[in-house]
Amino acid sequence: MYNRKDRDVHERKEDGQSEFEALNGTNAIMSDNSKAYSIKFLTFNTWGLKYVSKHRKERLRAIADKLAGHSMLTPISDELLPNGGDSNENEDYDVIALQEIWCVEDWKYLASACASKYPYQRLFHSGILTGPGLAILSKVPIESTFLYRFPINGRPSAVFRGDWYVGKSIAITVLNTGTRPIAIMNSHMHAPYAKQGDAAYLCHRSCQAWDFSRLIKLYRQAGYAVIVVGDLNSRPGSLPHKFLTQEAGLVDSWEQLHGKQDLAVIARLSPLQQLLKGCTTCDSLLNTWRAQRQPDEACRLDYALIDPDFLQTVDAGVRFTERIPHLDCSVSDHFAYSCTLNIVPQGTESRPSTSVKRAKTHDRELILQRYSNYETMIECIHTYLKTAQRQKFFRGLHFWASILLLIASLVVTTFTANKAGWSSIFWVLFAIAVSISGTIDGAISFLFGRSEIRALIEVEQEVLDAEHHLQTFLSEK
């Protein structure tokens, strides 16, 4: 469906502009020096949990209105406004990647409100109870889409956490920019529920990041400029972050602009300076939903990791820090992250003709870092494998014990019914509870438990294969 804007686009295309340039307006600016087109991204975790997220409808509508250019949000500081300008004027993006869009009605409102400004839209679907919550709004034509579902993604027994039920995934969108094909990989990786231990789910996120890095390499080798965006639930320097940068060959757009930062120094800054200098999108004290956190808990979890061969960061920062006036609350429990990238046009090749792997294996320091990452990953998998095997065993044991208890309850009922008829009700309820819990644990043990263990072993073997290859390379040196 084409509107007046679409007709204007095609009229401008006749004058020699690509569709991307026409749609992108002033953002698609070609630099005389670098001969690069710029494209502006936004990634935002919208906190759209049904029944759980407070003021969900009002917040999601405020987000949609702001993206559409009709916002009445109140800034918390003029320093946080891009270039010190008007909030609405600076919220003009080319591509918007959203996470936690888990209610269809929220998506319908977003899509409708932003249709004229962002005509290319996509909500991704997977999971059991709801989708992965991933969506994209774009001024740039979408060429193709693909959803990769993480095989290792939490446990069905963690019902109150929900990661397994929503089907955490990677939403891949290929954009037709008219300059160079871009593959945007939007994801919301497994959440940590503790800093240490089993509830931290480090192994799950590391396995997800490992799979992620495989996909990134494939797309890079195919000639795409890859951009990974989303709430990756991993701090800078963590194992998942290393897989997505050192292993996959991407760079952190924020670090490309500001350099690597000492997280301990960022933790000691004031909340406002943490946003300005550390881009702490999560757990900031300036976010009303995280006001009870400690200052040193503020961190950066929302990213745009980019292909350094074809992309260069020229601007980046925290966005959507404003509040909804009548509710006096932030629009999400995360702040958004935005970056403007220069794209090297096709034909201006900067990537070596050899594969990504071969190009990187000539950097000995990087090889040693990757080797260390593999060792850490194997240790991480071994640690969690013990937990997975133990849980599978005890859930299976519960299943067989439930069968014995069920038989025993039936036998006991026949004897007690003659002496105390009312006791039959107790034994029937007991049998029902035993049957339900035993069946659930049995299914988790025999179906999920086996699948998870095999998936972990497969990742371990993949890491070992990569490690053996690096060992061969290092021994040759």
UniProtKB/Swiss-Prot annotation:
The chain crosses the membrane at residues 399-417, 425-449. GO terms for biological process: cellular response to hydroxyurea; ceramide biosynthetic process; regulation of mitotic cell cycle spindle assembly checkpoint; sphingolipid catabolic process. Pathway: Lipid metabolism; sphingolipid metabolism. It catalyses: an N-acyl-(4R)-4-hydroxysphinganine-1-phosphoinositol + H2O = 1D-myo-inositol 1-phosphate + an N-acyl-(4R)-4-hydroxysphinganine + H(+); a mannosylinositol-1-phospho-N-acyl-sphingoid base + H2O = mannosylinositol-1-phosphate + an N-acyl-sphingoid base + H(+); an inositol phosphomannosylinositol-1-phospho-N-acyl-(4R)-4-hydroxysphinganine + H2O = mannosyldiinositol-1-phosphate + an N-acyl-(4R)-4-hydroxysphinganine + H(+). Present with 2170 molecules/cell in log phase SD medium. Mg(2+) binds at residue 100. GO terms for molecular function: inositol phosphosphingolipid phospholipase activity; metal ion binding; sphingomyelin phosphodiesterase activity. Residues 418-424 are mitochondrial intermembrane. Its EC number is 3.1.4.-. Its cofactor is Mg(2+). Belongs to the neutral sphingomyelinase family. Its main location: endoplasmic reticulum. It is a multi-pass membrane protein. GO terms for cellular component: cell periphery; endoplasmic reticulum; endoplasmic reticulum membrane; membrane; mitochondrial outer membrane; mitochondrion. Responsible for the hydrolysis of the phosphosphingolipids (IPS), inositol phosphorylceramide (IPC), mannosylinositol phosphorylceramide (MIPC), and mannosyldiinositol phosphorylceramide (M(IP)2C). Regulates sphingolipid metabolism in mitochondria, especially the formation of alpha-hydroxylated very long chain phytoceramides. The generated ceramides contribute to the normal function of mitochondria. Also active on sphingomyelin (SM), but this activity is probably not physiologically relevant. Keywords: Endoplasmic reticulum, Hydrolase, Lipid metabolism, Magnesium, Membrane, Metal-binding, Mitochondrion, Mitochondrion outer membrane, Sphingolipid metabolism, Transmembrane, Transmembrane helix. The keyword Hydrolase applies. This is Inositol phosphosphingolipids phospholipase C. Residues 1-398, 450-477 are cytoplasmic.
